């Protein structure tokens, strides 16, 4: 399964792209064997964004059923989305758009205004609406594309 970071600042969400994807997605990645979801999201944030962030709370456990746009591969993905606190980091100093390199991959990051999400090519699609009303507790949901 996977974990993703929901990082918000001034009604903007941090999204990313890489050389393999034409769409935006949220920072995160796969949970390793014997790793907790909480440790995994903090590790992924450290690897991708080079910061030590804090978890505020889990938001969603999403079952996603989709066909990956680039490879055409079918997925049934479980992902836990965490709200992340970056207030004690230097992330905002990197600007509205910035590029970081993780191992051999280049990641382009952008702060996208909530209102702009409707017109963006971003996954998961549910984030376009759910970002306006974050849950106070973990919500189970599914998304079929």
Residue ranges and their predicted role:
Residues 5, 58, 80-84:
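A structural signal for short, well-ordered beta-strand segments
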Residues 1-26, 54, 86:
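N-terminal strand-loop-strand
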Residues 19-24, 90-93, 97-145:
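Nudix hydrolase/Nudix homology domain
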Residues 8, 26, 53, 75-81, ...:
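Short connector loops at helix/strand junctions that flank enzyme active sites
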Residues 26-60:
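The catalytic Nudix box helix
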Residues 7, 83-85, 111-113:
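Short, well-ordered beta-strand micro-motif
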Residues 66-95, 130:
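Active-site-adjacent beta-strand/loop module that shapes the phosphate/pyrophosphate-binding cleft
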